[in-house]
């Protein structure tokens, strides 16, 4: 049996695991199995909060909505190409294909809208759990340039979009069924995006993985900018806590970073601007794009991260926290004298706390992948804890000191 897919529900109270032989659902606090079926090769599973409604991908193009309590199938849908991701909240069901996104009313399963996208093989997409701020975020589609070649009449229609070359995010209102903003988040193409539980914040990371940015939604103001490290890394998972005061980030390194969303770490340009016109917004986004270029370059050549991260929670941790405080204070003072584009190079804040994943042998639910250890992260709604699920079939719980930060402590482990 191999593990195909793993995800938390919208409030992190449940964990769902899709395998080559059925699926399992666990409560996270306490960690315990609440449902299991051993039928079917399940590619993707998504839950609707703590309800018995579960969305399953049983074959590449077939979606099944199931009621686990009644053990009945509510509906089935077949799509023209492979389903790469499924997102849902109490108002909307979102199906992500490589070059299309389908929006459904989850109450009636009526198709509301179809979005044409650029090729999106990694299914980059985020749906807000909120029923009020019901926003969808995905990479801005990039139109294909006009071709001088005239294909024969019998040829299938050519592609209308090309793979994005920059990291722009489109914000779509799934209630009004209209695009409402474009955020120029990164110079490089996007690797990961996530929305908070209220649908008021979005975190973004590019394929370089050195800089993490947080913007307000829907207006797209940049609020925070964090440095994960100076060495490029693939970002696998990002998650806000339920109060949106912390952001947890996992990557192809075995260090998980926690960033504090506080006034001290806000960007200098994070002041409200309620009277922005469309032209003003385009202008501000253009200038942000130029700053993003500088920030991403700095991300590649900035101060080197301690490769070994051999923190023992005492001397090294104290030195690290002290240097962070000095750095942020110095940047704040210098930022007042430097031009904005230059001051932002000083700005990215380091992590507030971090977690080192333990070395472990693949468990019985592992997928057998010999590549980098992939992980999905979430933060408990009730306690200062980080939950981590890894591709080798392990579930970890770490305690975090919210007052001092530093290295998290492993308290529970399940395989």
Swiss-Prot record:
Looking at the record's lineage, which domain of life comes first? Eukaryota
Q: What is any Pfam family matched here?
A: PROPPIN
How does the UniProt record describe the way this protein sits in the membrane?
Peripheral membrane protein
- What family does the entry list? Belongs to the WD repeat PROPPIN family.
How does the record comment on the protein's domains?
Answer: The N-terminus might form a beta-propeller domain involved in specific binding to phosphatidylinositol 3,5-bisphosphate (PIP2), leading to the association of the protein to the membrane.
Q: How does it assemble?
A: Component of the PI(3,5)P2 regulatory complex.
Q: What is this protein called?
A: Autophagy-related protein 18
- Give the source species: Aspergillus niger (strain ATCC MYA-4892 / CBS 513.88 / FGSC A1513)
From the broadest rank down, the organism's phylogenetic lineage runs:
Eukaryota, Fungi, Dikarya, Ascomycota, Pezizomycotina
């Amino acid at each position: 049996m191999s593990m195909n897919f793993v995800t938390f529900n919208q409030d992190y109270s449940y964990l769902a695991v899709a395998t080559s032989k059925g699926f399992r659902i666990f409560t996270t606090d306490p960690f315990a199995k609440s449902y299991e079926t051993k039928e079917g090769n399940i590619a993707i599973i998504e839950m609707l909060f703590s309800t018995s409604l579960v969305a399953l991908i049983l074959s590449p193009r077939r979606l099944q909505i199931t009621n686990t309590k009644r053990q009945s199938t509510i509906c089935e849908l077949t799509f023209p190409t492979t389903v790469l991701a499924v997102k849902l909240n109490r108002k909307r069901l979102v199906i992500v294909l490589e070059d299309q996104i389908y929006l459904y009313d989850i109450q009636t399963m009526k198709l509301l809208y179809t979005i044409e996208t650029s090729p999106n093989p990694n299914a980059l997409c985020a749906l807000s759990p909120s029923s009020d701020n019901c926003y969808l975020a995905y990479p801005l589609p990039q139109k294909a340039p006009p071709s001088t070649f005239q294909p024969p009449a019998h040829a299938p229609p050519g592609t209308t979009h090309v793979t994005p070359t920059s990291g722009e995010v489109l914000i779509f209102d799934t209630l009004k069924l209209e695009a409402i903003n474009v955020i120029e988040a990164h110079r490089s193409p996007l690797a990961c995006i996530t929305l908070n539980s209220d649908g008021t914040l979005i975190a973004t990371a590019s394929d370089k993985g050195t800089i993490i940015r947080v913007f307000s939604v829907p207006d797209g103001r940049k609020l925070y900018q964090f440095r994960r490290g100076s060495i490029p890394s693939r970002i696998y998972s990002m998650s806000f806590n339920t109060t949106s005061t912390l952001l947890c980030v996992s990557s192809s390194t075995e260090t998980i970073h926690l960033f504090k969303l506080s006034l001290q770490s806000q960007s200098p340009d994070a002041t409200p601007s309620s009277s922005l016109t469309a032209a003003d917004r385009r202008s501000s986004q253009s200038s942000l794009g130029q700053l993003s270029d500088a920030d991403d370059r700095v991300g590649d050549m900035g101060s080197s991260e301690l490769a070994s991260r051999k923190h023992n929670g005492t001397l090294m941790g104290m030195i690290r926290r002290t240097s962070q405080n000095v750095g942020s204070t110095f940047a704040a003072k210098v930022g007042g004298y430097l031009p904005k584009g230059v001051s932002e190079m000083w700005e990215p804040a380091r992590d507030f706390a971090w977690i080192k994943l333990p070395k472990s042998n693949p468990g019985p639910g592992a997928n057998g992948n010999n590549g980098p250890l992939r992980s999905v992260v979430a933060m408990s709604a009730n306690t200062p804890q980080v939950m981590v699920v890894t591709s080798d079939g392990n579930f970890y719980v770490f305690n975090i000191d919210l007052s001092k930060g530093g290295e998290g402590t492993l308290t529970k482990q399940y395989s």
